[in-house]
A protein has these predicted regions:
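N-terminal Rossmann-fold NAD(P) dinucleotide-binding loop
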Residues: 195-196
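Adenosine-nucleotide cofactor-binding segment
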Residues: 187, 203-254
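Short glycine/threonine/proline-enriched tight-turn/helix- or strand-capping micro-motif at secondary-structure
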Residues: 27-37
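Cytochrome P450 core scaffold surrounding the K-helix E-X-X-R motif
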Residues: 58-64
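NAD(P)H dinucleotide-binding glycine-rich loop of Rossmann-like/cofactor-binding domains
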Residues: 105-189
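Glycine-rich beta-strand-centered segment in the early N-terminal region that forms part
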Residues: 37-53, 66-112, 132, 150-153
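Nucleotide donor/acceptor-binding cores
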Residues: 8, 95, 182-183, 208
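Eukaryotic N-terminal low-complexity, Ser/Thr- and Lys/Arg-rich leader segments
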Residues: 1-18
């Protein structure tokens, strides 16, 4: 288990990339390596020593594409986080955890009807959790939302960071679609990160056939290696002539 640091080492977005529509000039974004104070933890909060943090396309959107963040720069990006609790509530000390990418407020109508992922008051590391994000040595987070890692075997803790978002996004889709063993599943956009996880998730949940549709042949071939049964390149195939007999669950991934 790590120790409580004197400072948090972080890579902060101090300026996102901007584009001037009048002059057509682009001002590159800027990320700086900084040391920031370790905050006093509030009741119910813990300090997590970060083992790994995935780079989500959302992070790229914040930095390169002008997608606004709730917390303004300087801001540490990163919301796919795994690590070890080093301070805070005693029951959590020393435990390996995954920090959810979305932390609902648990009070609104969406939360009370099981749609906490759509909560309008949600907090998100690297966006709306103050200035804190996963591209740092440590991050303070509410303990109520943590997912304890109890038996990861030989899988490095850092590799589990993507479970916070890239893996749980397709899992939620599969559960909401009521995917059943023996179903045939079509994954539209299987060549992206979420799409690849969707294909693997569907197979793990008992799908009879996983059919991937996308346009990048090299990545389609990779999807076959990761468990897809069939792949269709939409650039040179007539998808309308492709038939799947049995129940089909379609999931578009972006």
């Amino acid at each position: 288990m790590g120790s409580i640091p004197d400072k948090i080492l972080t890579w902060q977005m101090v300026q996102p990339t901007t584009f001037n529509r009048e002059t057509k000039e682009t001002t590159p974004g800027k990320i700086e390596k900084k040391e920031i104070p370790v905050p006093d933890l509030k009741p119910g909060e813990v300090l997590v020593e970060v083992a790994g943090c995935g780079v989500c396309h959302t992070d790229l959107g914040y930095f390169y594409d002008g997608v606004p963040t709730v917390s303004k720069p300087p801001l540490t990006l990163g919301h796919e986080i795994s690590g070890t609790v080093v301070a805070g509530g005693e029951p959590w000390i020393g435990k390996e955890v995954i920090v959810p990418a979305v932390m609902p407020d648990r009070t609104c109508i969406l939360c009370k009807t099981g749609r906490g992922n759509r909560c309008l008051g949600q907090k998100m590391p690297g966006n709306s959790l103050g200035s804190y994000g996963g591209f740092s040595s440590h991050i303070p987070v509410p303990s109520i939302d943590l997912c304890e890692v109890r038996d990861r075997g030989d899988i490095p803790l850092a590799h589990l960071a993507v479970v916070a978002d890239a893996a749980t996004t397709p899992y939620q889709a599969a559960k909401r679609a009521d995917l059943q063993p023996g179903d045939n599943v079509v994954v539209i956009g299987i060549t992206g990160g979420v799409g690849q996880y969707m294909g693997q998730m569907a197979k793990a949940l008992g799908a009879r056939n996983v059919i991937g549709i996308a346009r990048n042949q090299e990545k389609l071939d990779r999807a076959l290696q990761y468990g897809a049964d069939f792949c269709i390149n939409s650039k040179d195939k007539d998808v309308r002539r492709s038939r799947v007999n049995s129940r089909v669950i379609a999931r578009k991934t972006v």
